[in-house]
């Protein structure tokens, strides 16, 4: 799918231009910053693994990346995040208004592009997905500064706000190839499990010394009052003193550096990171098993490698 992938990278840049110069300036900056483009790649691999022979997958892979980027622009404003992939965020450079408007532009351009495919199933899939992403982010916002969040709720949130777009990317590959329902469901499960593992690893990296090396702002989730899996584990399994520290820190709008570092040390000295990594490993095992419904081919093998890459970012 190398040629397909390059076609998507080209289209991502060309279709993001606008007669509004500020929009073009920001989108050009966004799409030359790098990024793994895992979601578009997943869609391409799943379509080809299902023996799809058309070119609508190029358009839909572009749509997936636009939706993903739009959510990042909006999320960074909501979270007041100043770094993404090790560089200043759009709202830090151009202001909240510009970042929000460019996010809106990318959403609308995504829907313009998907109408070119002319498939109501595709439209319905994207409509459901964008709704789910918004609900997941709202759920996370509601539970900010809440130390009592359960693992079940944590998983619900990350499946909605992160894993859903992976699920859609994989599922669309089967829809384009007009696969039977069983194969479509299998690929959707594959995407959902990969996306869940991807977010768990991302949450581990917030407390890892490796986080900064891949462009993450260390302890950003903790500073924003977000309870993710490593912190959740420590809160449930830690000492009374550690629980008090977590409660105080999470419920404080501006925690001190000493509080943040004390929690990071406690997490690194506990079993929290191995516990979270083990859960991510299980998600990847389930993702790979879900691909058993496909006959062996090079794109299926590549999809398995993509799943393992999501896990191995920590290594």
Cite the ranges covered by each PLM segment.
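All-alpha prenyltransferase/terpene-synthase fold signal
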Residues: 1-315
């Amino acid at each position: 799918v190398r040629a397909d992938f390059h076609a998507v990278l080209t289209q991502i840049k060309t279709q993001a231009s606008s007669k509004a110069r500020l929009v073009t300036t920001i989108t050009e900056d966004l799409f030359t910053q790098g990024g793994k483009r895992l979601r578009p790649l997943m869609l391409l691999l799943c379509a080809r693994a299902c023996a799809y022979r058309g070119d609508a997958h190029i358009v839909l892979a572009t749509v997936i990346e636009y939706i993903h980027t739009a959510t990042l622009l909006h999320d960074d404003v909501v979270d007041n995040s100043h770094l993404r992939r090790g560089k200043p965020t759009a709202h830090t450079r151009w202001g909240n208004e510009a970042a929000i408007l460019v996010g809106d532009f990318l959403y609308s351009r995504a829907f313009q592009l998907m109408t070119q495919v002319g498939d109501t199933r595709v439209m319905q899939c994207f409509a459901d997905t964008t709704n789910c992403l918004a609900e997941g982010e709202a759920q996370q916002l509601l539970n900010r500064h809440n130390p009592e969040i359960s693992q079940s709720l944590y998983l619900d949130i990350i499946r909605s706000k992160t894993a859903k777009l992976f699920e859609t990317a994989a599922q669309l590959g089967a829809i384009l190839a007009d696969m039977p329902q069983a194969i479509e469901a299998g690929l959707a499960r594959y995407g959902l499990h990969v996306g869940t593992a991807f977010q768990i690893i991302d949450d581990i990296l917030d407390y890892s010394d490796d986080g900064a090396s891949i462009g993450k702002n260390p302890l950003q989730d903790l500073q924003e009052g977000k309870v993710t899996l490593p912190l959740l584990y420590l809160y449930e399994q830690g000492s009374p003193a550690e629980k008090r520290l977590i409660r105080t820190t999470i419920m404080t709008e501006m925690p001190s550096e000493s509080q943040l570092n004390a929690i990071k040390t406690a997490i690194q000295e506990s079993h929290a990171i191995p516990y979270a990594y083990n859960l991510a490993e299980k998600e990847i095992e389930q993702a790979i098993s879900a691909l058993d419904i496909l006959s062996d081919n090079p794109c299926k093998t590549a999809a398995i490698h993509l799943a393992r890459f999501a896990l191995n970012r920590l290594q």
